[in-house]
């Protein structure tokens, strides 16, 4: 293992440690009563909501990299990408979708099953992109020669993941729920929650929401009203 590989591995492990530490503050059961119950698909889709907020970060910083890369908080991009890697790729994609949901949907057949290969290919491409982004931002600054390819890559990643998550929300997850039936759906929902708590040491969703909100504040993206479309001329 090269010195560069060691630094990358240590940074990744540090990211996981931060996520677990953050979860310790949110270790409160989500199923304290019927009103607090979270179904499997609701949980999956709100996890997508966290990841979509990271995509917004990517979309917003990309043009800024092209105009003044030195002014961009590259460390905040690295934190956002680490969150996508730990919460999105290693937990949501690998532990839930790839180990449980996709095999069930593929076995059930139909339209949803026909999407699985493309979704898996996009997961793999996303992980390649995540490694690239971390490599270009881990120093806390973006080099002049890296600004344009990084901006292009962030935009391409967001473009890929938006339809990816939308298909999962509207086709894959409903097919999964139908395939397992009411009893299996409830049991898998409990299993997914157990996986989340074992992985993060607490409520991973609450932790991720806190972290993404902090990233948005650092990058000046916390004001929702700033995204309101202008009036039609």
Regions found by a protein language model. Name each.
Residues 1-233:
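Small-residue-biased structural context
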